[in-house]
Design a protein with these regions (language model features):
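Long, contiguous binding/interaction regions
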Residues: 2-102, 107-135
């Protein structure tokens, strides 16, 4: 099956801090990531969790260009993934306070998975995150 959800652009750039963006020039802060593999198909699913989205705060999304995908940028270049799921989590007394956002996408090809993992290692190191295997 061709991989239509993830594209990888390789351009070596000087040390660039890894970022995750929905909108051009508006880096988001990742709260958690969950990685899963379908044992039958071998497809891998990534689920990003964000406690806040800068794109939503103060309606900044109206002033920045939407990519139509989530972009992961680092010194190796850019990964573009089309979300397969996007869930907004609300809470608070009135139920209208944004408590988080979950964004999922699939990776079908091994070389794209390896590239994604290199990005995640860089992102984790730059942001004080640690990988924990729950298998």
């Amino acid at each position: 099956m061709p991989d239509t959800t993830v594209s990888v652009e390789a351009t070596i750039e000087p040390a660039i801090e890894p970022t995750i963006e929905f909108f051009a020039g508006l880096p988001e802060t990742l709260s958690n990531v969950s990685l899963r593999k379908n044992k039958q198909t071998g497809d891998r699913t990534v689920l990003f969790t964000f406690q806040n989205l800068k794109a939503i705060e103060k309606f900044q999304s109206f002033t920045n260009e939407f990519h139509g995908s989530i972009r992961l940028k680092d010194s190796e270049g850019e990964i573009s993934a089309k979300p397969s799921s996007l869930k907004f989590i609300f809470g608070g007394d009135e139920g209208d306070d944004l408590k988080g956002v979950k964004c999922g996408f699939e990776i079908h090809e091994d070389e794209h998975w390896e590239r994604f993992m290199r990005f995640m290692n860089r992102y984790a190191e730059a942001n004080g995150m640690v990988y924990q295997d729950k298998a």
